[in-house]
Structure formats: C-alpha cells, structure tokens
Amino acid sequence: MEQPGPRAPDPSLCHHNLQPTDDPNWDSYATTMRTAFTPKTGAVPALIRQNGIRRLGYTYSLSDPILNQTQYSDEYTWKSHSKEDLIKTETSRGIKSHKSHLNEDIFLWTLPHCQQTGTLKNCLPWKIPASMKEVNKALSNQFISLTKRDFVDRSKAQKIKKSSHLSLEWKKLLPQPPDTEFRRNYQIPAKIPELQDFSFKYGCYSSLPVASQGLVPSVLHSYLRNQEHTKKQTTYQSDYDKTYPDFLMLLNSFTSSQVKEYLQSLSYKDRQIIDRFIRTHCDTNKKKK
C-alpha cells in the first residue's frame, strides 16, 4: 500500500513568502519587492584566459611570440612573389605548377606609328640595337607633358581657326531647343528704348535703375504730405482735422441773446474783433441771398 506523499504547503502561506502569524520573526512590512526579487547568487566563472584566440582572422597562442601582424597586414602588404608560381598550366591530369621559361608572347609591345612593324615582327624588342637618335628621342619624350601632346599650340589653333570658312553667326545656326513655359515666363525682360528715357526719378519710377535727367523738383508732394502727417499728434486729428471749422454754423446755432451775453463777458478789444467778424460775415451772407 502506497504511503501518502508530503503534503503540499498552503498557497496562502507561500504567496510572497509570507510566514504564519504565530512566528514572532514574521515581518509585517514585507513587500513584493523584498519577497519576489530576492538577491540571487550564482557561480562566478574563473578568470582564466584561453590558450588560443582568433584576433582579426589571425590565430596565435600564448606561447607564440607577439607579432604585429594581422589578417589585414597579411592581405594588403607588399610581398615578394615567388618565381615558382609565375606560370600555371592546365593539363588533362589537372592543374600543375612548375618552372618554365618566360615566353615572349606574354608581353605586349607597342611601337610608334611611323615605324614599320613588318621587319621587326620576328625580332624581340630588347634585341634590336637602338641608335643614338632613338635614345635621344626617348629621353626627350620623358619631358613632354600630356597637355603639350594632346592640346594644340595656341598659334596653331589660331591658324586653324582663320583657315576655316565658318560664318560669324555660327551661334544662330546651332539647333535651339523649343521654348518651354519656364523659359517664356522667366526670361530676361526686353528693354524698351521709349521707356528708358525718364526726365524724373520719383514716385512710382524711383525704383527703376535709371539716372534722373532734366530738372528735378527740390520739394516733392510726398515730402509735404509726410510733414503734414508728422505735425498731427493723433489719428483723429489726421483723419478729421482736414477742414476748418464753420464759424457761421456755430453762430447760427446760438440765439442773439446768448451772443450778447457772451460778448459782454469779454474784454473791450476781444469784443471789437468779434463784432467786426460778425458784421462782415453777416453782411456777405445777406448780399448772397
């Protein structure tokens, strides 16, 4: 008969590593951070360096001598080629490398255009005895630049230009592409000679790049207008203070008794001035009627 296994612990007690309340060491302030994220201790690997390591494709061991050599220096540094593997011939048995003499067909030699190649076809170039003239020419050709060889001298170019029967209007004979909308709208505007002669340079024509001709007024209307605007202190005065006040309309708004009372309150000189003004204006209005 099978014996019952160990009893599983109560899940209420296992959750968050909580202990029963009967234990006096039970921490009532235990949080999830302290119970779930407990410090874990693991095995620390031994700090032992490997005997062999691959660095940039170059293998070496600790016992080998230290060399400043990597895969880059192996591939991209100059090496003296071995004379054994200069020529590799392929046979029916496979690829075989062996020593062989240099064949004269390997090298391609170019001769000058003026030199005949028929007589020297069967003779190697280094076996031809060079004359003193050829030696001097070879030495002088070392100092001829590409510009002097490829480009014609300016004096020769002028002779060629004069000898050619090309018309002076050769630019008009060139094929012109059709005008596009951009070329038609954004081309340089044509200068009309009638509009270029201005005898004044102010107003709407002041921005034109043309010097003024003839008499120019010393005081412009724009200067007077700007001066009038600077005298005004407020916008109301600049907008509504353009006309003088109508004194006759003011006098007609008052009665004769009000005018007499106002005149009596003034001094003798002011009263004479206002009386003269009223009589002159009243007489002119009566004559007009």
Swiss-Prot record:
The lineage of its organism: Eukaryota, Metazoa, Chordata, Craniata, Vertebrata. Residues 69-83 are annotated as: Mn 2. Residues 233-247 are annotated as: Mn 5. Residues 1-26 are annotated as: Disordered. It comes from the Eukaryota. Disulfide bonds: none annotated. InterPro entries: MEDAG/TEX26 (IPR043460). This is Testis-expressed protein 26.
